[in-house]
Amino acid sequence: MRDMVTSHVVTASDRPSAGRAEDRSGPLLAEWLAGRGHTVERVVVPDGEPVAQAVRRAVEAGAELVLTTGGTGVTPRDRTPEVVAPLLCVEIPGIIEQVRAVGAAKGVAGAPLTRGVAGLVEGEHGRTVVITLPGSTGGVRDAIGVLDPLLDHLLDQVRGGDH
């Protein structure tokens, strides 16, 4: 596996994107990825089409991994799954299923309400792993727990590595 992985973290949240609140989940993801040796770029955008635009820009820039946080719930403004799902050429539903299961096992009543999606987006530089995660810091910590032992293998597989 290559030493340096380029990752993008996209926070989907109306208040932080307008400067009216602090983004707490994006920095958690960025810190975790940087600790794994990734080069990390971060952006905060309003939910909806700006999320899809940020994901497309990351793919076009050659990112190997894009993690979004926020916009996966059931409020009228939560649109991240709807705008990211059409970009996927391959779905990987087990990742989000596991994140939900971890939250539910901890007794988080709202864990089943996250509607995240995960998969691959085809770009001119190859395929990019895109995973849409909850916006809460607890949901992000659960996701990190799921992804930490899996991420190197996942990225290697996407690059064409063996099982």
Q: What is the predicted function of each stretch?
A:
Residues 1-163:
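Non-catalytic beta/alpha edge segments that cap or flank active sites
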